[in-house]
Each structure stands twice: as structure tokens, then as C-alpha cells.
From Swiss-Prot:
It comes from Haemophilus influenzae (strain ATCC 51907 / DSM 11121 / KW20 / Rd). InterPro entries: FAD/NAD-bd_sf, GIDA_C_N, MnmG, MnmG-rel, MnmG-rel_CS, MnmG_C, MnmG_C_subdom, MnmG_C_subdom_sf. Keywords: Cytoplasm, FAD, Flavoprotein, NAD, tRNA processing. This is tRNA uridine 5-carboxymethylaminomethyl modification enzyme MnmG. Homodimer. Heterotetramer of two MnmE and two MnmG subunits.
Length: 629
């Protein structure tokens, strides 16, 4: 039967990609439906109970800057906050929050249920309806049909998911949840390129059976960071420590003696796992020279006895998992509450997607999250937001929007996926970004909030707060530029006490702040430069902009050079077979990838600068040479 209402956007899946994908078009004013197999697991943290980290924290800030939910939920649920790389430069500093699973899920569900234009319905989707290569709706397990102008698929690990514990395996989307088998079969019929990936999770341990007294304690930061630009430290719940233990030679011996029972080492698992989050059996075999690996014991919540042992993800049999756990210091008498497991699942080649995350072959069908070959809550959330935005724009028949590589880590992520594809679970790192000095956590709002306002993603309160911050930054920079200190000043002696070398020529406040020994706090403690500004976010921007001005200007010059042809559009109907001078190999790769811009084409492996020049000449000849935004 047909459901009576027609939607603008339907989102399948209520994980980290799905929740952002549903909220974005709803905030833009589009009637949106979120289909989930279980409303009680919306925003579920299926693996590590943490948000953020190197590169990942940048994505969280970007999602927040565009009105997304993840940062707000992390602030509400974070039970230990840390700033990683705090002693390094601002480009690589990253926020991480250990999270209470229950509080996080509650924050997500509350936001979804209170969002206008958004309906939530509990049903497993089994079919995507398509007419003349255009999506028209979704069918569910109980025979309901929902009509929609666009559909976003965010199925995570559920598509033909198979769970492995030892040599035993069974269908499942994650522990306790069934797999989406029918939907997987339907998607395979669409002709999209599909393959298998694998991820895993460690056993959960009963905290009451751990001897914490003999373990090293890890506290969070004393000055607590905040994820959301609209957040406050007052949003954070009680803060608690994590603990550290280590594997040892006994642990490694248990693992080596049981590799014949490992689904990874006996060929049962065919999917490729995440390079940067390997299983403990992988670590022991790949790093055979190491006799110890550090394991973080992370609490799963303020009211839970479960502990997440970060670093021993495994698919070995349960008795072997017990041997691994009990071999470590402090865990000699520990009990496992939930066994660890590996899961294989379908993912689709992201090279079959436009940078908007719409499929190239089916209009109005978008993919986001792990089904695009990524790993991590943060990568999923960023994709969900982008897909949600473009699903809304598609409904309005407006121009699509997606960020450039020099604009955000989301832009880096999507460009890497859609241009290069991936054969293993992809995660974001700061090292993947060419212009990371410009793509910092602290300036995500400056980069993206004006765009979010233009797209209708943020409310007036956020916009007003952002504009006030920008005004504070400009006023303070003007103030520091206008106050000069000269060698005959009555304040010279006071200044020389904090300067590394005495002042010998006239200098403005900006000039003094550029000195390596000077900070904003020290500068504004000097009489001429009092008082300090109260807006700490604005202070941070002022200090970074002044101290790193030369480096920032250099990167901006590099970007302008790159932009010259980066955004030159290649029409979807461009016929490479009629371009003389291209080798058969280059022509085949271009036909396969169908890049949407010269910049994207240039990053395809094997596409030479000479080939790019030939394409540009032909675009010009055919009157197709149009610059993108």
C-alpha cells in the first residue's frame, strides 16, 4: 500500500550519517522522512564511545559550523575531553571527547524528535523505487510504499552484513541487529560497483572485575574544550578518567597459538579492514618485534559498568578473547560482558558518485557514510550533512553545492572518495589536506557558517553570534594596529621585561604579537594594550591570524594558482572518444571516472598534465570552457 504523504527527502538509516542527512533538509524546509529499523538505536555508537580525534575533530567542527548535530551531542555526552596535539601548531590540534553512549543517543533522539519538517518511522527499507533512472520512493518490509523526490541511503554496515566470532558467522548489521539482505540484493541489481569491507570491535569488559588500583590513570584536560561553536562547558556532564594497561608476551602467545581459529587468517573473511584501526591479531603479526601494545580502558558511560578496551578489536573465538583479556595487568580476573567480533558488509565504489554524493546513474539517489567506503562516525556525519543539503537542492532544482579541498576537510574527504575511490576503509587525517593551515578546527565557522546561512541551514541566533564574533575579531585587530609603542615611550621598560629582545624601533600591537615570545595574554597585560577582549574564540582568531599571517598568505596564493583550472567544469556529456591526442589508457580512465571538473580529472591516477592540457584545448574549441564558482 502507498503511504498517504509524499516526501521531499527520505533517509534510510538512523546512524551518524542518517541523522545528519535527515536534519539538514528538514532545517532547509523540506518535508523529510527518516526510516530506521529501530528508533531506540538512533545515533547509536556501535563501536568506540568517542567523538573526534586527529582530523576527525575537524570534521565535527565543520558539521557544527553548518548547523549539524554531532558537536552538540558530543558536548552533552562527553565524559572526558582532551585537546590532542595541544603543544603543536593550530592546524593539527584536535578535540576528542570520550562519550556516554546513553547520553549521546538521548541528545540525538531529542534533536530529531524536535526538528520541524522531520518524521521518523520504524521500518526496514527493502526496495528503492526507480522510474526512468530517477528515484521515486522506498518500499518497506511490511509492504508500505513511501513516495519521495530524493532518497539518501545511509545503511552503515547493515547491507548484507555478516558477523564473525571465530570460525562461526551469521547475518547481522551489528551485534543484536539483523542485516539488510533484501535491500542489498536490490542495490546490486542497479549495476553499481559493489565490494566488501570489514571492520571490528573489541569485547566489552565488566568494570567491577577490573583492578583499577594498579593501572595508570588518564585524566582529561583541566580546561575543558567545547565542540560546538554554540556550546558551553556547562553542557558537559560529570568528567571521569580512563585507564591504561598493556598487552604482553603472554597475550601475544595466546593470539599466535590460535591463528588457525581466526576468520581473518583462515580466509573466511574476505573484506579488507581499516588500516589505522587494526585488530589485535593483526598488530601482533604485523609488528612482531614489539612485545607490548598500549590499551586504553574507556568507560562507556556514567551509569554503565561496561568498559571499552581500545586497542584489542578482535574476531577470535570467545575463549581466546578471555585469554587475551585475562593476560593483561589489572584484567587478570576481568569478565567479558559482550564478545568482540568482526563484521563484513557491502560498500559501493564512491567513484560512481558525484561530489554531491548523488549517484551518477540514478537521479535523486544519494549515498552517505560507510557504504561509501569510509570508517568513523565523523566521516559518516560529514557525508550525511552534504548528502542532505544536496538532496534538498535537488528537490528545488537548484545548483548543487559541495566544498572544495581548500575549503574544508569534508571537501578533502569527498574529493578523495569520488576521484580516487578506496579499497580499504577510508579515514580522515590532517596529512590528507594540502592546505591544512587554513583548515583548522578553530576557524571552521569562518569557513562554512556563511555558506550554511545562505543555504538555510542555521537559525538566526547562530548567525547573530557568528557575526558578533567576526565584528569582535575585526575591532580587536584594528585596535592592536592603532596602538604603537616607540623606544621613547613611558611604557618601554614595562614592555622590555617581557620582550625577548629590547624594542629599538616603533612597533604596533600586531608587530609585537608576531614575536615568538609574545602571546595575546602577555600583550594585553601591558598598560598600553589593556584591556584584553573577553571573547576567547575571537582572541584565538586574532592571535593565529597575526602570528601565522605570512604562512596563511602563502597558502592562499597557492590556492589561487590551483584554482585557475580547478573548478573548470567538464560537461557530463563530454565525449572523450572524439578528443585526439589522448592515449587509450587515459581515455578509458576518464570514461570510467567521468570527472566533473579539471581539478578532479587531474587527481585521477595516470592522468598526465599533458592530457589535462588536451582536454582544456578541446573544451575551448567546443565552447564548453566555463569556470565553476
Amino acid at each position: 500500500m502507498f503511504y498517504t504523504e509524499t516526501y521531499d527527502v527520505i533517509v534510510i538509516g538512523g546512524g551518524h550519517a542518517g541523522t545528519e542527512a535527515a536534519l539538514a533538509p528538514a532545517r532547509m524546509g523540506f518535508k523529510t522522512l527518516l526510516l530506521t529499523h529501530n528508533v531506540d538505536t538512533l545515533g547509536q555508537m556501535s563501536c568506540n564511545p568517542a567523538i573526534g580525534g586527529i582530523g576527525k575533530g575537524h570534521l565535527v567542527k565543520e558539521v557544527d559550523a553548518m548547523g549539524g548535530l554531532m558537536a552538540h551531542a558530543a558536548d552533552k555526552a562527553g565524559i572526558q575531553f582532551r585537546t590532542l596535539n595541544s603543544s603543536k601548531g593550530p592546524a593539527v590540534r584536535a578535540t576528542r571527547a570520550q562519550s556516554d553512549r546513553v547520553l549521546y543517543r538521548q541528545a540525538v533522539r531529542t534533536a530529531l524528535e524536535n526538528q520541524p519538517n522531520l518524521d521518523i518511522f520504524q521500518q526496514e527499507a527493502t526496495d528503492i523505487l526507480i522510474e526512468q533512472d530517477r528515484v521515486t520512493g522506498v518500499s518497506t518490509k511490511m509492504g508500505l510504499t513511501f513516495r519521495a523526490k530524493s532518497v539518501i541511503l545511509t545503511a552503515g554496515t547493515f547491507l548484507a552484513g555478516k558477523i564473525h566470532i571465530g570460525l562461526e558467522n551469521y547475518e547481522g548489521g551489528r551485534a543484536g541487529d539483523s542485516a539488510s539482505v533484501n535491500l542489498s540484493h536490490r542495490l546490486r541489481d542497479l549495476g553499481l560497483r559493489v565490494d566488501r569491507l570489514k571492520t571490528g570491535t573489541p569485547p566489552r569488559i565488566d568494570a567491577r572485575t577490573i583492578n583499577f588500583d594498579i593501572l595508570a590513570k588518564q585524566h582529561g584536560d583541566e580546561v575543558l574544550p567545547v565542540f560546538s561553536f554554540m556550546g558551553s562547558v556547562d553542557d558537559h556532564p560529570q568528567q571521569i578518567p580512563c585507564y591504561i594497561t598493556h598487552t604482553n608476551e603472554q597475550t601475544h602467545e595466546v593470539i599466535r597459538n590460535n591463528l588457525d581459529r581466526s576468520p581473518m587468517y583462515t580466509g573466511v573473511i574476505e573484506g579488507i579492514g581499516p588500516r589505522y584501526c587494526p585488530s589485535i591479531e593483526d598488530k601482533v603479526m604485523r609488528f612482531a618485534d614489539r612485545n607490548s601494545h598500549q590499551i586504553y580502558l574507556e568507560p562507556e558511560g556514567l551509569t554503565s559498568n561496561e568498559v571499552y578496551p581500545n586497542g584489542i578489536s578482535t574476531s577470535l573465538p570467545f575463549d581466546v578473547q578471555m585469554g587475551i583479556v585475562n593476560s593483561m595487568k589489572g584484567l587478570e580476573n576481568a569478565r567479558i560482558v559482550k564478545p568482540g567480533y568482526a563484521i563484513e558488509y557491502d560498500y559501493f565504489d564512491p567513484r560512481d558518485l558525484k561530489p554531491t554524493l548523488e549517484t551518477k546513474s540514478i537521479s535523486g539517489l544519494f549515498f552517505a557514510g560507510q557504504i561509501n567506503g569510509t570508517t568513523g562516525y565523523e566521516e559518516a556525519a560529514a557525508q550525511g550533512l552534504l548528502a542532505g543539503i544536496n538532496a534538498g537542492l535537488y528537490v528545488q532544482e537548484k545548483d548543487a553545492w559541495y566544498p572544495r579541498r581548500d575549503q574544508s576537510y569534508t571537501g578533502v574527504l569527498v574529493d578523495d572518495l569520488c576521484t580516487l575511490g578506496t579499497k580499504e576503509p577510508y579515514r580522515v587525517f590532517t596529512s590528507r589536506a594540502e592546505y591544512r593551515l587554513l583548515l583548522r578546527e578553530d576557524n571552521a565557522d569562518i569557513r562554512l557558517t556563511p555558506i550554511a546561512h545562505e543555504l538555510g541551514l542555521i537559525d538566526e541566533a547562530r548567525w547573530a553570534r557568528f557575526n558578533q564574533k567576526m565584528e569582535n575579531i575585526e575591532q580587536e585587530r584594528q585596535r592592536l594596529r592603532s596602538i604603537w609603542l616607540h623606544p621613547r615611550s613611558e611604557y618601554l621598560e614595562e614592555a622590555n621585561k617581557v620582550l625577548g629582545s629590547p624594542l629599538v624601533r616603533e612597533a604596533s600591537g600586531e608587530d609585537l604579537l608576531r614575536r615568538p615570545e609574545m602571546t595575546y595574554d602577555i600583550l594585553t597585560s601591558l598598560t598600553p594594550y589593556k584591556p584584553a577582549m573577553e571573547d576567547k574564540e575571537a582572541v584565538e582568531q586574532v592571535e593565529i591570524a597575526i602570528k601565522y599571517q605570512g604562512y596563511i598568505e602563502h597558502q592562499q596564493e597557492e590556492i589561487e594558482k590551483q584554482k585557475r583550472h580547478e573548478n573548470t567544469a567538464i560537461p557530463a556529456n563530454f565525449d572523450y572518444s572524439k578528443v585526439s591526442g589522448l592515449s587509450n589508457e587515459v581515455r578509458a580512465k576518464l570514461e570510467q571516472h567521468r570527472p566533473v571538473s579539471i581539478g578532479q580529472a587531474s587527481r585521477i591516477s595516470g592522468i598526465t598534465p599533458a592530457a589535462i592540457s588536451i582536454i582544456l584545448v578541446n573544451l575551448k574549441k567546443q565552447g564548453m570552457l566555463k569556470r565553476g564558482e
